[in-house]
Amino acid sequence: MTPPPAKRQKRNEYRKANTAVADDASEIRLPQKKFYRQRAHANPFSDHQLNYPLSPAHMDWSSHYPAFVDPEPSHTNLAGTRKLLKDVEVVDIGCGFGGLLIGLAPLLPESLIVGMEIRVSVLEYVTARIQALRSQQQKLRSSAIPSESSPAAQQPQQHHQQQLQATETAADAASPSSPDATGETLSLVPGNYQNISAIRSNTMKFFPNFFARHQLSKIFICFPDPHFKARKHKARIISETLNAEYAYALRPGGLLYTITDVEEYHHWVLRHFGEEGADAGQNAGVTELFERVSDEELEKDDCVRVMKEATEEGKKVTRNKGNKYVAVFRRKADPEWPA
């Protein structure tokens, strides 16, 4: 039997060793991206072996957000799995290596954020990265709480809660809103990365299977594959059909964020949201459901800053001194039915 290529074997050995270290819990290491290499793109029209729920009410989120699982065991969904205390409301479509998820986690600590990625190895990296960051935060929290053998541990429980809150407040003030380029954090951050996760999914096919009507408050589409060839435009993640699905899942007042370094793709986005160059009747439905957010509002939105600076593609564009084109659209209230 022919052995696997040397590079692939090395990657497999690294992942096994990394899993052993994680199980040991004596040392917490962040995963190395070089051991999770994969092709830059995946064909969304291929029949990938994907697991997806029958409906949003069948989706099992409990394994993704264990800190938010409803403590009442009888509260289960249609699939019989435990419900969460709150719904997922922020989605990063095509999350890549998870830079935006990591950046948004401390910025939106009370919101559950999920990344959707179709590539297997990339998803494995993001999952390992999130688990490592959670373990780091747990270790920092444990070191911040006095041990039971110390004199301080004999004080009332109320004092413990006040001390922990003071520690977290100081950490929040001292730490930046997002980690550095390596993803390492040396202090506690709001939410402790318990509010982020990633799933493997084909958004073009199964987006409505995961999210109910008006469930989402934010959707991010960061540096999507531009598919330059005209015959590939049907694979673009922004289209009339997909925009209708995004509008279905977004609640009124919710925001859809887009950013790209390709100017032609930026104009494609504007056309498909009825902002420029479209026929009056072509995108009539879209213009009834979305309106573009002004540049003045975007300057005050921290999510736009994170979207530009925290993603891996955004950092690469900055290094190459390229341009970043941002467009954000607000979901309007549903139009009234004609009498």
Curated annotation (Swiss-Prot):
<keyword id="KW-0819">tRNA processing</keyword>
<feature type="active site">
    <location>
        <position position="225"/>
    </location>
</feature>
<keyword id="KW-0489">Methyltransferase</keyword>
<feature type="region of interest" description="Disordered">
    <location>
        <begin position="141"/>
        <end position="186"/>
    </location>
</feature>
<protein>
    <recommendedName>
        <fullName>tRNA (guanine-N(7)-)-methyltransferase</fullName>
        <ecNumber>2.1.1.33</ecNumber>
    </recommendedName>
</protein>
<keyword id="KW-0808">Transferase</keyword>
<feature type="binding site">
    <location>
        <position position="94"/>
    </location>
    <ligand>
        <name>S-adenosyl-L-methionine</name>
    </ligand>
</feature>
<dbReference type="GO" id="GO:0008176">
    <property type="term" value="F:tRNA (guanine(46)-N7)-methyltransferase activity"/>
</dbReference>
<comment type="subunit">
    <text>Forms a complex with trm82.</text>
</comment>
<comment type="function">
    <text>Catalyzes the formation of N(7)-methylguanine at position 46 (m7G46) in tRNA.</text>
</comment>
<keyword id="KW-0694">RNA-binding</keyword>
<dbReference type="GO" id="GO:0043527">
    <property type="term" value="C:tRNA methyltransferase complex"/>
</dbReference>
<feature type="binding site">
    <location>
        <position position="222"/>
    </location>
    <ligand>
        <name>S-adenosyl-L-methionine</name>
    </ligand>
</feature>
<feature type="region of interest" description="Disordered">
    <location>
        <begin position="1"/>
        <end position="20"/>
    </location>
</feature>
<feature type="binding site">
    <location>
        <begin position="311"/>
        <end position="313"/>
    </location>
    <ligand>
        <name>S-adenosyl-L-methionine</name>
    </ligand>
</feature>
<keyword id="KW-0820">tRNA-binding</keyword>
<dbReference type="InterPro" id="IPR029063">
    <property type="entry name" value="SAM-dependent_MTases_sf"/>
</dbReference>
<comment type="similarity">
    <text>Belongs to the class I-like SAM-binding methyltransferase superfamily. TrmB family.</text>
</comment>
<dbReference type="GO" id="GO:0005634">
    <property type="term" value="C:nucleus"/>
</dbReference>
<dbReference type="Pfam" id="PF02390">
    <property type="entry name" value="Methyltransf_4"/>
</dbReference>
<keyword id="KW-0539">Nucleus</keyword>
<feature type="compositionally biased region" description="Low complexity">
    <location>
        <begin position="142"/>
        <end position="181"/>
    </location>
</feature>
<dbReference type="GO" id="GO:0000049">
    <property type="term" value="F:tRNA binding"/>
</dbReference>
<comment type="pathway">
    <text>tRNA modification; N(7)-methylguanine-tRNA biosynthesis.</text>
</comment>
<dbReference type="InterPro" id="IPR003358">
    <property type="entry name" value="tRNA_(Gua-N-7)_MeTrfase_Trmb"/>
</dbReference>
<keyword id="KW-0949">S-adenosyl-L-methionine</keyword>
<feature type="binding site">
    <location>
        <begin position="202"/>
        <end position="203"/>
    </location>
    <ligand>
        <name>S-adenosyl-L-methionine</name>
    </ligand>
</feature>
<dbReference type="InterPro" id="IPR025763">
    <property type="entry name" value="Trm8_euk"/>
</dbReference>
<feature type="binding site">
    <location>
        <begin position="117"/>
        <end position="118"/>
    </location>
    <ligand>
        <name>S-adenosyl-L-methionine</name>
    </ligand>
</feature>
